[in-house]
């Protein structure tokens, strides 16, 4: 049995706004959190494989990035300041068409490095060559929900379905259970009804959920209404998509009925505020969705449209954007923003029984943040300091599935210099430089 004790930290369990243990300790045994309490309260506290002294730090659940395209780190800064469809058709898709399996592996390795160093322990990914994405996840020690993005109008549509099924068979539940799989028809505007039906049948066959972009732009909203006589959400509802667990990314352009459907039927909505701002897609009505009872997590989207994977930045931007768009400073307060970036993100991906909280019986995905920094002083409100003042360099240590993957800012599972060298070389080749 492997026993890891984290001692002396203030523990933000995310079980409630007041569920904070000052100078506490938590014990992780064989990947499971088995004890959370006051110092010295863990049984056999002298018989540990590893002890982390965490005085002056906060222990909290790792951040959960509900929606990204990890390998797109290769495209960071390649194409900016363009409308979504121009950006995709003229820049992103041609670049991606030149990418090899190894390019995708190394791009994902860089994404995992960036996420670990900014406190993300789990992410939801939609992309191509997912075997290579899974290899990177397995090597780095991260947790991930992976899905092979499928474009139903592309010549590769049938091949993508085969690869999606191979991903499910080969990787669902692998890497000691850290990898789970969903089925990912790209979006209603790229997947006709007959193709969506094939995707739903595949998901039902393997008891998987659906991961899909939905109602991201006004163009999509209007085009789907013109083509099918319904909004994108109602179109998918009529097709029966929401009979399966659905993680819907973006959900920017919604009417009242759409919001009711998502609140009642979707497993979760992935809110991507910075990508939506950068691409001028609009502002998702998240405050209203939450009021209706929807489960909303936070995603960064890919680095080509953000341009980083920093969940602290994302949750802060997401909170502030809702405040100003509703002209109500009380919507999405600090604790709610942290919930969206942790336990609500886990629920969105069907992982709420495993991660997102620090409590006995959950897997040991924990981060330690340094609170002894000028921008974290004074401490009138710990939760507000984390949500509104902390930055990614405050993340000192990252534990995933009970294993220490970063200790005192040193990532133990990744050769940082090699990863950045590989990405620089490959990005230059792909860009034709």
Swiss-Prot record:
Function (record text): Catalyzes the deamination of 5-methylthioadenosine and S-adenosyl-L-homocysteine into 5-methylthioinosine and S-inosyl-L-homocysteine, respectively. Is also able to deaminate adenosine.
Source species, domain of life: Bacteria
Keyword set, alphabetical order: Hydrolase, Metal-binding, Zinc
EC numbers: 3.5.4.28, 3.5.4.31
Cofactor notes: Binds 1 zinc ion per subunit.
Catalytic activity annotation: S-adenosyl-L-homocysteine + H2O + H(+) = S-inosyl-L-homocysteine + NH4(+); S-methyl-5'-thioadenosine + H2O + H(+) = S-methyl-5'-thioinosine + NH4(+)
GO molecular function: 5'-methylthioadenosine deaminase activity; metal ion binding; S-adenosylhomocysteine deaminase activity
Name used for this protein in its record: 5-methylthioadenosine/S-adenosylhomocysteine deaminase
Enzyme class, first EC level, given as a word: hydrolase
Disulfide bonds: none
Lineage start: Bacteria, Bacillati, Bacillota, Clostridia, Eubacteriales
Spans traversing the lipid bilayer: none
Signal sequence region: none
Keyword DNA-binding applies: no
Cofactor: Zn(2+)
Binding site for Zn(2+): 67, 69, 213, 301
Protein family according to the UniProt entry: Belongs to the metallo-dependent hydrolases superfamily. MTA/SAH deaminase family.
Residues where substrate binds: 96, 148, 186, 216, 301
